[in-house]
Amino acid sequence: MLSFLSSNLSNVRQSLAQVLNFALVLSTAFMMWKGLSVFTASSSPVVVVLSGSMEPAFQRGDLLFLWNRSPRAEVGEIVVYNVRGKDIPIVHRVVRTFPEIEGKTKKVKEISESSPIPNNMLLTKGDNNVADDVELYARGQDYLNREEDIVGSVRGYIPMVGYVTILLSEYPWLKTALLGIMGLMVMLQRE
């Protein structure tokens, strides 16, 4: 009887240790993500290209690394932005910059790279698109605000690595299957 209790306690301890190990892995990944977010000053320091609008520069499934510590965006720079009211990041190139305007009556002029006025307003366009992105912006928005809409500027990429993310979002059953396999592996792991 005593051996039965000790084996059950051992199983409970082992199961608890596995659950704690799994929680440690999850919390470590979360802390690394948040640390990277603070380091890059971007809410999403790594994004996946979801469409072909930036071909040939980036293909669908490319993994992009972002940096958001630059005070201004230059024409030709590739930025990632979120449209107000939507949660899908868009990767496009800056085609024009404008100084920030205070009123509708003030005329907006394009600024040069040597201008001391910060270029906080941006117009973007996908390399593979015919027109600029004004149609993609929120209703009534004619340009992006550098501080409010931009997630970050692209500083590096790894081709095709992000395609796994696209597959998981397009086939939800695959996500469930992978989570089930990972959970089963954690539970069956013996030290």
Curated annotation (Swiss-Prot):
GO terms for biological process: protein targeting to ER; signal peptide processing. One of its GO terms (cellular component) is signal peptidase complex. Keywords: Endoplasmic reticulum, Hydrolase, Membrane, Protease, Signal-anchor, Transmembrane, Transmembrane helix. It is a single-pass type II membrane protein. The keyword Nucleotide-binding does not apply. GO terms for molecular function: serine-type endopeptidase activity. The chain crosses the membrane at residues 19-39. It catalyses: Cleavage of hydrophobic, N-terminal signal or leader sequences from secreted and periplasmic proteins. Residues 40-191 are lumenal. Residues 177-188 are annotated as: C-terminal short (CTS) helix. InterPro entries: LexA/Signal_pep-like_sf, Pept_S26A_signal_pept_1_Ser-AS, Peptidase_S26B. Residues 1-18 are cytoplasmic. Coiled coil: none annotated. Its EC number is 3.4.21.89. The active site is at 53 (charge relay system), 92 (charge relay system), 133 (charge relay system). It is found in: Endoplasmic reticulum membrane. The C-terminal short (CTS) helix is essential for catalytic activity. It may be accommodated as a transmembrane helix in the thinned membrane environment of the complex, similarly to the signal peptide in the complex substrates. Belongs to the peptidase S26B family. NCBIfam families: sigpep_I_arch (TIGR02228). Component of the signal peptidase complex (SPC) composed of a catalytic subunit SEC11 and three accessory subunits SPC1, SPC2 and SPC3. The complex induces a local thinning of the ER membrane which is used to measure the length of the signal peptide (SP) h-region of protein substrates. This ensures the selectivity of the complex towards h-regions shorter than 18-20 amino acids. SPC associates with the translocon complex. Catalytic component of the signal peptidase complex (SPC) which catalyzes the cleavage of N-terminal signal sequences from nascent proteins as they are translocated into the lumen of the endoplasmic reticulum. Specifically cleaves N-terminal signal peptides that contain a hydrophobic alpha-helix (h-region) shorter than 18-20 amino acids. This is Signal peptidase complex catalytic subunit sec11. It comes from Aspergillus oryzae (strain ATCC 42149 / RIB 40) (Yellow koji mold). The gene is sec11.
